[in-house]
Design a protein with these regions (language model features):
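Glycine-rich nucleophile elbow surrounding the catalytic serine of serine-hydrolase chemistry
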Residues: 142-154
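Short amphipathic alpha-helix adjacent to the substrate-entry channel of hydrolases
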Residues: 84-102
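Hydrolase active-site cap/lid region
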Residues: 155-213
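Alpha/beta-hydrolase fold nucleophile elbow
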Residues: 133-144
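Short beta-strand element of the alpha/beta-hydrolase
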Residues: 67-76
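A glycine/proline-hinged amphipathic helix-loop "lid/cap" segment
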Residues: 1-64, 293, 297-319
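Alpha/beta-hydrolase active-site loop
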Residues: 112-131, 288
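Short beta-strand/loop motif that positions the catalytic acidic residue
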Residues: 233-235
Length: 319
């Protein structure tokens, strides 16, 4: 990573912000303004659809695809974000793997606190399976809060008796609602995006009074990961959430899970979003694509109902 590249990223992330707490509407607008600046690959086909009763964005390579499906969960602290704000990440995974992706527009807090998001993502996965997608051809992926959902959706699916996906990829995941990781304090001021206060504020909206000491909220410290599929956890050394990934990786190894902890020095939260700007972002996405290509296989069974949405539900998202 050149100094010039890092300067561009720091300038973007450290823009002056309003003093004091911001409204949910302001948080959502600010996040959308930031994330829509990210570079999205060309040659993608985008279709708005529904999956498990929720809106979703279907992303495909424009030049034909391989047999594989990424179920993607966007970030945004469980309070903001959408499939559109994550399109750089979803699109880059699709472009690099040749797989299709469904990015789920799950319900957000504070209007819909825990466990609404997990209920939506599990329903989306169940809908994929019901449509004929083989679980060995599915990977869960997401960034930040969505990276946490990639893990907790897998937990909830396992506990519901569903067959598990072939792999999980989590970019800078949020995995500990107890906020007990040392990096929550040691990276304060180093992280150009988050402060403990900001993380705890959005976290409280998601919790809405729920006890954070439960596996679906704090898998890094409480989850039994027995039987989990292979996982790739990518995180930067400058993140408040660094220890969320390091502790989950340790729990996964203790449970016999095939896990790769991929730590990149000197980069911010969800640095993969800066593909085309940061060399490390492109390199990390390449590694994620290799990981997925090696672990996602299987076949597409007959009866792909997910592709047979009504015209009203399945319309081009391109302008």
């Amino acid at each position: 990573m050149s100094k010039e590249q890092r300067a561009r990223v720091d300038a973007l992330l450290r823009q002056p912000r309003p003093e004091g707490p911001r409204s949910v509407e302001a948080l959502r607008a600010g996040f959308e303004a930031l994330m829509t600046q990210m570079i999205v690959p060309d040659a993608l086909r985008l279709t708005r659809t529904t999956l498990g009763g929720r809106p979703a964005l279907h992303v495909e390579p424009d030049n034909g695809r391989r047999a594989g499906t990424i179920l993607y969960f966007h970030g945004g602290g469980w309070v903001y974000g959408s499939p559109e704000t994550a399109l750089s990440l979803t699109g880059n995974l699709v472009a690099r793997t040749g797989f299709e992706a469904y990015s789920v527009d799950y319900r957000l807090a504070p209007e819909h606190p825990f466990p609404a998001a997990i209920e939506d993502t599990v329903r989306a996965y169940r809908a994929l399976l019901d449509s004929g997608v083989d679980p060995s051809a599915v990977a869960f992926a997401g960034e930040s809060a969505g990276g946490g959902l990639a893990v907790t959706t897998c937990l909830a699916a396992r506990d519901a008796g569903l067959p598990l996906p072939a792999a999980v990829v989590a970019f800078s995941p949020g995995l500990d609602a107890t906020r007990t990781g040392e990096s929550m304090d040691t990276k304060e001021g180093v992280d150009p995006i988050f402060t403990r206060e900001a993380v705890e504020r959005t976290g409280a909206m998601y919790l809405a009074g729920a006890d954070p000491h439960q596996p679906l909220l704090s898998p890094a410290v409480l989850a039994d990961l027995t039987g989990f599929p292979p996982m790739l956890l990518q995180v930067g050394t400058n993140e408040l959430l660094l220890d969320d990934s390091t502790r989950l990786a340790a729990r996964a190894r203790a449970a016999g899970v095939d896990v790769i902890l991929d730590v990149t020095a000197g980069v911010p939260h969800v640095f993969q979003s800066f593909a085309g700007v940061l060399d490390e972002a492109d390199e990390a996405l390449d590694r994620a694509a290799v990981f997925l290509g090696q672990r996602v296989g299987g076949r597409i069974r007959a009866g792909r109902a997910a592709r047979a949405s009504s015209p009203a539900e399945n319309r081009s998202a391109e302008s």
